[in-house]
UniProtKB/Swiss-Prot annotation:
Species the sequence originates in: Glycyrrhiza uralensis
Residues at which heme binds: C471
Region forming the signal peptide: none
Cofactor(s) demanded: heme
Gene: CYP72A154
Biotechnology: Saccharomyces cerevisiae expressing Glycyrrhiza uralensis CYP88D6 and CYP72A154, combined with the expression of Arabidopsis thaliana beta-amyrin synthase (beta-AS) and NADPH-cytochrome P450 reductase, accumulates glycyrrhetinic acid (GA) and, to lower levels, beta-amyrin; these GA production was increased in the presence of G.uralensis cytochrome b5 (GuCYB5).
Entry's family note: Belongs to the cytochrome P450 family.
Name assigned to this protein: 11-oxo-beta-amyrin 30-oxidase
Length: 523
């Protein structure tokens, strides 16, 4: 370039920059002030109430809410009437308490409309195209994306391929794996018993290991040992994420850090191990040697059929990367959900021995001292009532959020694009207007005639979601919980330890913050 042309080029660059500055400023003013205030006016015109929007360039409000939540969780509460919502769901609880059920709260620059009306909830769950999930947090790629995060045609394709893995006939073949893993845990507990046949055990870590072992066996079968290594890496990834989640620096995930580097290394290890297992299985499948008696085998077989049915379409089946994401999701969803369900069940049955006795009597009537079988599990009415009630009081997830990408009518509301709707599962499950004056108490009797009768036909009970996107693994989780609970009731009676501190908290699921110490008595 000629030296004389250099000043001209510099002036061109400076002119472009100077012209871009006012455009950028206008964009930021609109994003940070004009648009939020416009959305707020629209919501107030609909009769919704909430705090006024305030411009905040830091995370002071989120930090304040987190502080309130941490202070609340620093003290234990009683189990007789457990109103856990103020402790673990501070923003929604305070908003509803202050403004009523027709209200909204702010999450950054986006207003979040709190939906508690069963008819509106039904509409949100059913119209999955109109109410998609919000955009992924950048950290999600380090844990799992998979089915729960996909939308539209991609979600429909993955759901179709995954569904066969969770058909009841397939799950029936996995019952021996459930029983085997549970018997191993029971043997460990029996080894801890004193001479009088009792011991105190924090059952929470044992139940986490149990459900991890079950997923390893049922997801990978013959590749169980390799699967267990992958799940150990996923556990380490989860711990790394927990140390990073409190980083409040804006755009933190765009900056280099030790935590981010460690998570990338773990992700590479997970990917390499999973890819090795999948490649071997795919090779065996093509040669006709593969079995489909575990989740991965069924998934690959279903994917193979999908690809074979439309060989000319690149989008027919799942890629290897997508199969890996679904395998990670099997672990995260299957392990955490069932472990938490079993922990809360033992806590509540330890507190309510009359229900424990009724459940044990039923289990012994149906199975005696034999291993639970598929046919008998369907006859466990009391056990099912107990599990439903535990899931009502302690659902795995405490809320669901959906985003509006276009103006929509929801019931009598006209909601503009840019708004989010939040379904506060925990608040609805504990609502005295729906469940009666004992809504915060443990009373499985409310489910004596099933869910439809208990809810009066309303959409107000959804521990696994509802509608087309209801959790594909709910039958897996409930079958596993029934088998484990049946085996425990056959072998032990148990009570809540005096050292137990009741502090529900959310990590990936709603779980006991300080564990679940239980006193076991051998039967």
């Amino acid at each position: 370039m000629d030296a004389s042309s250099t000043p001209g080029a510099i002036w061109v660059v400076l002119t472009v920059i100077l012209a871009a500055i006012p455009i950028w400023v206008c964009h930021m003013v609109n994003t940070l002030w004009l648009r939020p205030k416009r959305l707020e006016r629209h919501l107030r015109a609909q009769g919704l109430h909430g705090d006024p929007y305030k411009l905040s360039l830091d995370n002071s409000k989120q930090t304040y809410m987190l502080k309130l939540q941490q202070e609340a969780q620093s003290k234990s509460i009683g189990l007789s009437k457990d109103d856990a919502a103020p402790r673990i769901f501070s923003l929604a609880h305070q908003t509803v308490h202050k403004y009523g059920k027709n209200s909204f709260a702010w999450e950054g620059t986006a207003p979040k409309v709190i939906i508690t009306d069963p008819e509106q909830i039904k509409e949100v769950f059913n119209k999955i195209q109109d109410f998609p999930k919000p955009k992924l947090n950048p950290i999600a790629k380090y844990i799992s994306i998979g089915l729960v995060q996909y939308e539209g045609d991609k979600w429909a394709k993955h759901r179709k391929i995954i569904n066969p893995a969770f058909h009841l006939e397939k799950l029936k073949g996995m019952l021996p794996a459930f029983s085997h893993s549970c018997h191993e845990m029971i043997s460990k507990w029996k080894g801890l018993l004193s001479s009088d046949g009792t011991c105190e055990v924090d059952v929470w870590p044992f139940l986490q290991n149990l459900t991890c072992d079950v997923i390893s066996r049922t997801a990978f079968g013959s590749s169980y040992a390799e699967g267990a290594k992958i799940f150990e890496l996923l556990k380490r990834q989860g711990y790394a994420l927990m140390t990073a989640r409190y980083a409040r620096i804006p755009l933190w995930w765009l900056l280099p850090s030790t935590t981010k580097r460690r998570m990338k290394e773990i992700e590479r290890g997970i990917r390499d191990s999973l890819e090795g297992i999948i490649r071997k299985r795919e090779k065996a499948l093509k040669s006709g040697k593969s079995t489909d008696d575990d989740l991965l085998g069924i998934l690959l077989q279903s994917n193979h059929i999908e690809n074979k049915g439309d060989e000319n379409s690149k989008s027919a089946g799942m890629t290897t990367q997508e199969v890996m994401e679904e395998c990670k999701l099997f672990y995260l969803a299957g392990q955490e959900t069932t472990a938490a369900l079993l922990a809360w069940t033992m806590v509540l049955l330890g507190k309510h021995p009359e229900w424990q006795a009724r459940a044990r009597q039923e289990v012994l009537q149906v199975f005696g001292n034999q291993n639970p079988n598929f046919e008998g599990l369907g006859r466990l009415k009391i056990v099912t009532m107990i599990l439903y009630e535990v899931l009502r009081l302690y659902p795995p997830g405490i809320y669901l959020t959906r985003a509006l990408r276009k103006d929509l009518k929801l019931g009598n509301l006209l909601l503009p694009a840019g708004v989010q709707v939040s379904v506060p599962i925990l608040l609805i499950h504990h609502d005295e207007g729906i469940w009666g004056n004992d809504a915060k108490e443990f009373n499985p009797e409310r489910f004596a005639e099933g869910i439809a009768k208990a809810t009066k036909g309303q959409v107000c009970y959804f521990p696994f979601g509802w509608g087309p996107r209801i959790c594909v693994g709910q039958n897996f989780a409930l079958l596993e919980a029934k088998i484990v609970l049946s085996l425990l009731l056959q072998n032990f009676s148990f009570e809540l330890s005096p050292t137990y501190a009741h502090v529900p908290t959310t990590v990936l699921t709603l779980q006991p913050k300080h564990g679940a110490p239980i006193i076991l008595h051998k039967l």
